[in-house]
From Swiss-Prot:
Residues 357-366, 512-524, 564-575, 908-923, 1037-1046, 1117-1131, 1147-1168, 1192-1226, 1310-1328 have a biased composition (Basic and acidic residues). The gene is AUL1. This is Auxilin-like protein 1. Residues 117-142, 241-318, 357-383, 459-480, 512-541, 556-575, 908-946, 961-1046, 1077-1168, 1192-1241, 1254-1328 are annotated as: Disordered. Residues 1270-1299 have a biased composition (Low complexity).
Length: 1450
């Protein structure tokens, strides 16, 4: 084997020293196995070393070579069997090594260091290093160290905890260069066993505590060593896999080193799985204390380079081992001494990882133990991402918390950010405390308040070492100690304490001594330890408004949960929400004020919440009216900022949080928020109020507490105080109503300024002082606070634009629908007389001025009806639980007919006269009693006639009067006794789900004499008009039935308004006290709705005199201030007088109403039928249109295809005609040429014959002349003979010359010969003529066939082409499919393709096919022209495929 040997004679102990920085703790078993591990060489894997160390066979000379030299030196051969000692039996094999080496070590960058810390570091270096170990300064770079990527995994998390549950850091070996680390790791969530699968480990980053403060250190950049070790192999066995560029950071008392583990470290961790399991036994000793180990303690590193000596390997190894042990003991003793010196000044401020509850115990001054409930689960999550080696910084812990908070609460990305986004500035703790105290002094001086009421973050931080077990910080690399000056946090209890003091000062009522004592005992434990002289300026108080308001809305809107749910779970979720939000707030405060705000999430894990809450402020208590045990909610701490709720408030509204007690939010915070809202809109600035009302409708519930505060102040001591705990349903509904009155507060003050006001000056002054107190608490010294608060309102306007547009669109649709229904309804009334309506309108003309007075109020609260739909679901839930389902359903039906009778009810808005209302109330009350006796009448009939617009007017007025009653409590309480009696009389109607509603009782509230006189005049006028109406009703009943019905409708309008008010108030006034208070005001209506309406109409129709008496009795009741006994007695007397009347006319009214309902039902059915018909027509039209479109599309497509086809046909025909013409021209040319040749031959033959005959004639004439001279007597005979011979041989005999010459000897012989010749010539000419005729017949036949072929060519060519497509030059395919083109009548027997596999079978089939389709064979068989044409084409295709087949075969 070959190893690299160092050229320098470096000692073995120096090797240990240089490599000491690679480890921090080791186990007790097989500690020094790493001494004998060697660097992994590509030539020799680890398994080879294991085989060598164990030895092979019985040979005692197989001893492993244990020297591990450096890798950058020359090579030398080593004899493995040079030693006799088997070290494997002494030190154990690699597979059994049990030391623990961290895969990653923490390195913290040192950015800025104070001079004190630097001096202390130098002192520690001097005292902590031995003479033979070189010092490593901050800037000094070690060549043995290389960078390893940080992955937020602390080394000590792989070490299990001890019996006490705490974890300590095993003493760093003495041979490690540089000062001894004094880092203490407190992490209870440790891995007991490293599994083979990948298990990410969360990061635990710690700061080094110092006596003077905390410092952050930066790791110096190191140069890489000459050899790069694949760091990924280190974690091959324990499942932790990283990249080779990862860096491991090591803490050394503020000095940072970048360490790269050598290959021996890789060998160690690549052992068996059991080695990883033995890591669980490494931990011993408590946290923050280093214990001295024995000689065999884990003080030797698991890997280092050893110098090799060829001759004495064992001797040098033993010497180096002893020296390493001694140095380790020395180092450990030094470290122990240094830790003892630091015990007194140590301070730990860590925050645990878990966001859940944790228990913290304080064991002395040096032991810190943290037990986190969910830390094991959190260990499976990597909270920081890998960073590049060049960056060499920790992953931001704040980002990790922000991610976890966003994941837990479903908050969008941009809302929660960690404090690492801030740009930190490093300050001393002393300066921070001084600056904090200065801010507190200025705040107390500004408010002139005693110290300790408001507490800041720094005070809580100072009391932590006393009240709580110290927690450790979890800093970012970039995060430093940050002052908290601009952003204090307040508890609800602290705010409630101040509020309670103010309330007691004005009301004289004290909170129960029992709870006060309990509060004092609990607070003393905390307040005594907090600095009393700290309080923030007014800007910080203003910053608390948005978060407090958000928290209130969050508590109120969340459904009430059962009492059985543990209070600890409530605190955990609330604290998580607050802490997650305070990170965002601290970031905003830093950007605006320039201060670095420390995130309040230091308590987000709940580590100190429980302890703090137990000792915290418990002043947020609310007394119930009997003084029983109060319900106390634990105070929640919040760090607030002025701009936090701009984006976060919308998310918190939807966040499900456990419901806390309403008294907490009502008592301590809500009133302050409400006064700050009032401060935004001054009384004179009505436009600003209106704008705020329209733009911020969702913030209405925060006004609830201001009502409660003032009610506590105004309530007499003898009466029951309204400051009591209400159910969630009552509070939600009452809050929504009260906010209507508060929104129009300033507008109502302007209206009331025209009339005299009689108010209690003492209570009014108290109210003013209390208002100014809260205004001062939440208003800055300059206009910055107001501007920021106003900007908060302005910022939400944009978010409501979309909602308002959608709401307006929805309302328009509803208005159109209702108006359509109204038109149908009005159509049934078109024949009625209009005189009564005009009279009714004239009666109302005198009161139009009242409407003008309230026009501004209607404008201010016009948006309330739009917001009714937003809160419809909340109102429904509240009404169902309180038994108001019936009233809510009535209100919903009223909303459906909101604008149906807009014109008829326009003048009802001014019907606010209290005296007239009392008269109507008495009448309806009497008729209600009669109706209760007679039985129930169908209540659904009049329900459809309700008019919403009239109800809207009175809903607005109810809100105004409720607010006025708050301002004048004495007048309101004066009527409370009357309310009780009225409630008793009308208990049945209240139980049915309806409640009596108050209206504008201006005489009681204004208290002005002039107003009372004017109302008295109006009362008289109303009485006269009422008598006239009753008289006219009686006359009309006897005369005209239609006129009577019209008067009924006029009277219904008034009753509808009362019903609308009753239905609205049933939802608005779930509280019993508010119902009673509403019932006592002047404008009283019948609460039963339809029954009161029917009774009232029947009484007015039937008995004019009886109702006159009722009006007189009512008038007397109105003149009385208390009106209790007289009202009751008059109702009883009048009930006896009118009971018979109502009983007789109940059926008539019921029939009348039934007819109306039937008419409306028929109209509704007709409308539905029309809608259905229209829908069917529309669908039929749509279907017809779709069909027409489809047909049109098809027609267009067909036309396009036809045009294309027409364009293609001429082209094809032209091509076919050209081809036919070519073929015809060739045949015709051939026939013409043949014909010409035949004619020429005939002409030549005829010319020859004519010449011969002429020649014979001339010769015969000459011979005859000579014979006549010779023989004179025989002239005539010879002439006749010559004539016969010439005639008989004219065409046959051509050479008559010799014959004539021979005939001269024999007279009869030449004549026979000439005859024979002529016959021969005749036969020849006949044969020629026959041949010519035959030829002509053949030519004609050929021409016919050609014509037929041309006619069939187009169709046959298409068939042949279709058959041969894809099979060109494929002989097998053509032959196997030949039957498809030839046809069944051809007689061709198909040949399957399976028979054409071999070449021989293909050749045989080809010959058979060619014989069958050959043109000559077809001619012999007498085939038709079509068959001939097809066979010719097939023959040509087969011939071409055969040529291709032959080429392929060759």
């Amino acid at each position: 084997m070959e190893y690299e040997k160092s050229p320098t004679a470096t000692t073995f102990s120096r090797k240990i020293s240089n490599n000491r920085s690679h480890s921090l703790s080791f186990s007790a078993n097989a500690v020094y196995d790493g001494v004998f591990s060697s660097p992994v060489n590509s030539k020799s894997p680890l398994v080879d070393y294991g085989e060598i160390f164990r030895g092979s066979g019985p040979s005692p000379s197989s001893i492993p070579f244990l020297d591990v030299p450096e890798l950058n030196v020359g090579k030398v051969k080593v004899d493995v069997r040079s030693s006799k000692l088997d070290y494997s039996s002494v030190f154990g094999g690699l597979g059994a090594c049990d030391f623990a080496v961290t895969p990653k070590e923490v390195i913290i960058k040192s950015e800025k260091k104070t001079s004190i810390n630097e001096d202390k570091k130098r002192n520690r270096r001097k005292g902590g290093n031995s003479s033979d170990v070189p010092l490593c300064n901050e800037g000094k770079k070690s060549p043995e160290m290389v960078r390893m990527k940080h992955s937020d995994i602390s080394y000590h998390q792989t070490v299990p905890r001890n019996e006490n549950g705490a974890t300590h850091l095993t003493q760093v070996p003495a041979t490690m260069p540089g000062p001894i680390p004094t880092q203490v790791v407190d992490n209870t969530s440790l891995l007991h066993k490293i599994e083979s699968k990948s298990t990410p480990i969360p990061a635990v980053e710690k700061k080094l505590p110092c006596n003077e403060g905390r410092e952050e250190v930066k790791a110096s950049r190191k140069q890489g060593s000459k050899t790069e070790v694949d760091f990924e192999n280190i974690f091959a066995r324990d499942g932790c896999s990283t990249r080779d560029d990862s860096t491991c950071k090591t803490v050394s008392n503020g000095e940072y080193r970048d360490v790269k583990p050598p290959s021996s470290f890789q060998c160690t961790l690549n052992g068996e799985h059991g080695a990883s399991e033995r890591l669980s036994g490494l931990n011993s000793g408590p946290s923050e204390r280093y214990e001295t180990e024995d000689a065999d303690s884990p003080s030797s590193p698991p890997y280092f380079d050893a110098e090799t000596d060829e001759n004495s390997v064992a001797a040098e190894s033993s010497a180096a081992l002893k020296k390493a042990i001694e140095e380790a003991q020395i180092r450990m003793n030094i470290a122990k001494q240094m830790m003892e010196k630091k015990k007194s000044g140590f301070r730990s401020c860590a925050k645990l990882k878990s966001c859940d509850d944790s228990k913290i115990e304080n064991k002395g001054n040096t032991k810190v133990e943290g037990i986190t409930e969910e830390s094991r689960d959190n260990n499976s999550q990597i909270l920081g991402e890998m960073v590049k080696p060049s960056e060499q910084s920790f992953s931001n812990e704040g980002d990790q918390h922000a991610k976890r908070a966003r994941k837990l609460w479903g908050v969008p990305e941009g809302l929660l950010k960690s404090t690492s986004d801030h740009k930190p500035e490093e300050l001393e703790e002393q300066d921070i405390i001084t600056l904090e105290e200065e801010q507190a002094r200025r705040g107390r001086k500004h408010w002139e308040l005693p110290g300790g009421i408001f507490k800041s973050v720094m005070n809580s931080k100072q009391q932590e070492p006393e009240n709580l077990a110290p927690a450790k910080p979890e800093p970012d690399t970039k995060q430093e100690v940050q002052p908290i000056t601009e952003n204090p946090f307040y508890t609800f209890g602290q705010l409630g304490s101040k509020l309670k003091c103010v309330v007691e000062a004005f009301t004289g009522s004290k909170v129960s001594q029992k709870d006060e004592k309990q509060f004092t005992e609990k607070e003393n434990s905390t307040v005594t330890q907090m600095v009393q002289d700290e309080e923030s300026d007014s800007q910080e108080m203003l910053a608390g408004i948005p978060v407090i308001e958000t928290y209130l809305r969050e508590v109120e809107e969340t459904p009430q949960q059962t009492e059985s749910k543990s209070e600890m779970n409530i605190e955990e979720k609330s604290e998580s929400t607050i802490c997650a939000f305070t990170e965002r707030s601290s970031q905003n405060m830093e950007k605006e004020t320039g201060w670095q705000v420390k995130s309040a999430c230091k308590f987000e894990d709940g580590s100190g919440v429980k302890d703090f809450q137990e000792n915290g402020d418990h002043t947020c208590n609310v007394l119930d009216q009997e003084g029983e045990k109060e319900i106390v909610s634990e105070p929640q701490e919040m760090l607030v900022g002025p701009d936090d709720s701009k984006t976060y408030v919308r998310e918190v509204e939807e966040t499900p949080t456990p419901s806390l007690n309403k008294t907490q939010s009502d008592d301590s915070v809500g009133a302050m928020v409400s006064f700050n809202r009032v401060n935004i809109s001054e009384p004179g600035n009505i436009d600003e109020v209106q704008e705020a009302v329209h733009k911020v409708p969702r913030r209405r519930r925060v006004w609830k507490t201001s009502e409660d505060v003032y009610n506590m102040i105004k309530a007499p001591k003898g009466n029951n105080r309204p400051w009591q705990l209400e159910s969630a349903e009552n509070e939600t509904t009452a809050m929504s109503f009260h906010e209507e009155g508060v929104r129009i507060h300033h507008a109502s003050e302007e209206i009331e300024s025209t009339s005299g006001q009689a108010s209690d000056s003492g209570l009014q002054e108290n109210w003013t002082v209390l208002k100014q107190m809260f205004r001062q608490m939440f208003q800055t010294a300059d206009t910055k606070g107001e501007d920021e608060t106003y900007c908060l309102v302005e910022s939400e306007r944009g978010h409501l634009d979309i909602h308002q547009k959608a709401q307006e669109k929805y309302e328009q649709v509803e208005v159109e629908t209702v108006r359509t229904n109204y038109e149908a309804y009005a159509h049934t009334r078109e024949n009625e007389d209009e005189s009564a309506q005009e009279t009714y309108c004239r009666k109302e003309d005198g009161k139009v001025e009242v409407q003008g007075k309230t026009s501004l109020v209607r404008e201010l609260i016009g948006e309330e009806l739009e917001m009714a739909s937003l809160e419809e679901e909340d109102v429904q839930e509240a009404s169902e639980e309180a038994g108001w389902v019936q009233g809510l359903s009535e209100l919903n039906e009223i909303n459906e007919h909101a604008d149906s009778h807009a014109e008829m009810l326009e003048y009802d808005r001014s019907e606010t006269d209290s005296n007239n209302s009392r008269e109507r109330f008495d009448q309806t009350q009497e008729q209600a009693e009669e109706t209760m006796i007679d039985g129930s009448i169908d209540t659904d009939t009049s329900r459809s006639s309700f008019e919403m617009r009239q109800g809207d007017s009175y809903i607005e007025e109810v809100g105004i009067e409720q607010h006025r009653s708050d301002q004048f409590p004495e007048k309101a309480s004066a009527v409370s006794n009357t309310e009780e009696h009225i409630e008793e009389i009308d208990s049945d109607s209240i139980q049915s789900g309806w409640s009596v509603v108050e209206d504008d009782d201006r005489s009681l509230q204004d208290g002005g004499a002039s107003q009372a006189e004017s109302k008295h005049d109006e009362l008289e006028e109303t009485k006269e008009e009422s008598d006239e109406m009753k008289t006219s009703l009686g006359v009309e009943r006897n005369g005209d039935k239609k006129e009577l019905e019209h008067q009924f409708e006029c009277q219904e309008n008034e009753t509808y308004r009362s019903n609308v008010e009753a239905a609205e108030s049933s939802c608005r006034f779930p509280n019993g006290e508010e119902i009673i208070g509403a019932a006592t005001n002047g404008n009283m209506k019948e609460n039963e709705g339809e029954e009161g309406e029917e009774s009232c109409r029947s009484s007015m129709e039937e008995e004019g005199d009886a109702t006159s008496d009722i009006g007189a009795a009512t008038d007397g009741n109105m003149k009385e201030n208390e009106g209790e006994e007289s009202c009751r007695s008059s109702m009883e007397e009048e009930g006896d007088a009118t009971s018979d009347i109502s009983q007789n006319k109940a059926e008539t009214v019921e029939e009348h109403l039934k007819k109306i309902d039937e008419t409306r039902e028929k109209e509704r059915e007709r409308k539905q039928e029309r809608v259905m018909v229209e829908r069917a027509i529309r669908e039929a039209r749509e279907r017809a249109f779709a069909d027409a479109m489809e047909r049109a599309g098809k027609t267009a497509m067909e036309k396009a295809k036809a045009v294309a086809h027409r364009r293609e046909v001429p082209r094809k025909s032209e091509k076919g005609s050209v081809e036919v013409n070519d073929k015809l021209s060739s045949a015709e040319k051939a026939s013409m040429q043949a014909k010409l040749r035949a004619e020429r031959a005939a002409v030549e033959r005829a010319i020859t014959e004519v010449r011969e005959r002429a020649m014979e004639k001339a010769l015969s004439g000459k011979s005859a002349a000579s014979q006549a001279k010779s023989y004179g007597g025989s002239k005539s005979f010879s002439s006749s003979g010559e004539r016969r011979g010439s005639s008989s041989s004219g065409t046959e005999n051509k050479s008559s010359g010799p014959s004539n010459s021979s005939n001269q000897t024999a007279k009869g012989e030449p004549i026979q010969r000439c005859k024979a010749r002529s016959e021969r010539h005749q036969r020849t000419s006949d044969r020629a003529a026959e041949a010519l005729a035959e030829k002509k017949l053949r030519d004609l036949k050929t021409q016919k066939e050609q014509t037929e072929r041309n006619r069939l060519a187009e169709a046959l060519d298409a068939d042949v082409k279709r058959w041969s497509s894809g099979k060109e030059n494929n002989l097998r395919a053509l032959i196997s499919t030949l039957q498809y083109i030839l046809g069944a009548e051809s007689g061709w027997k198909p040949i399957p393709l399976t028979d054409l596999v071999s070449s021989a079978s293909v050749r045989k089939a080809y010959r058979k096919a060619t014989l069958y389709v050959h043109p000559d064979k077809l001619q012999q068989r007498g085939a038709s022209t079509q068959q001939k044409y097809i066979c010719e084409k097939v023959f040509d295709l087969l011939k071409e495929a055969w040529n291709k087949f032959g080429a392929d075969e060759r």
